[in-house]
Amino acid sequence: MARRRKYEGLNPFVAAGLIKFSEEGELERIKLNPRTAILVSITVIIAILVLNILHPL
């Protein structure tokens, strides 16, 4: 029988080869303050609500 490799401590996506890393800090390209993320989310929600009120489907 074939032996299965054990990927201990790895993310399943990395183990499956779906994500390829060339450098360790590659995912940290976008630095976003949590307060900014919340404000952008609230702004988008308010914009959607206002557009829904102005032009209902």
From Swiss-Prot:
Biological role stated in the UniProt entry: Involved in protein export. The function of the beta subunit is unknown, but it may be involved in stabilization of the trimeric complex.
Q: Where mainly located?
A: membrane
| Its membrane topology | Single-pass membrane protein
Which gene is this protein's source?
A: secG
GO biological process, any: protein transport
Q: Which family does it belong to?
A: Belongs to the SEC61-beta family.
Protein name as catalogued: Preprotein translocase subunit SecG
In this entry, the parts of the chain located on the Cytoplasmic side of the membrane are: 1-33
Q: Give TM regions.
A: 34-55
Q: Which UniProt keywords apply?
A: Cell membrane, Membrane, Protein transport, Translocation, Transmembrane, Transmembrane helix, Transport
Intervals, Extracellular compartment: 56-57
Domain of life of the source: Archaea
The record's Pfam families line, in alphabetical order, gives: Sec61_beta
Record flagged with keyword Transmembrane: yes
List where in the cell it is found: Cell membrane
Q: Name one GO cellular component term.
A: plasma membrane
SUBUNIT field = Component of the protein translocase complex. Heterotrimer consisting of alpha (SecY), beta (SecG) and gamma (SecE) subunits. Can form oligomers of the heterotrimer.
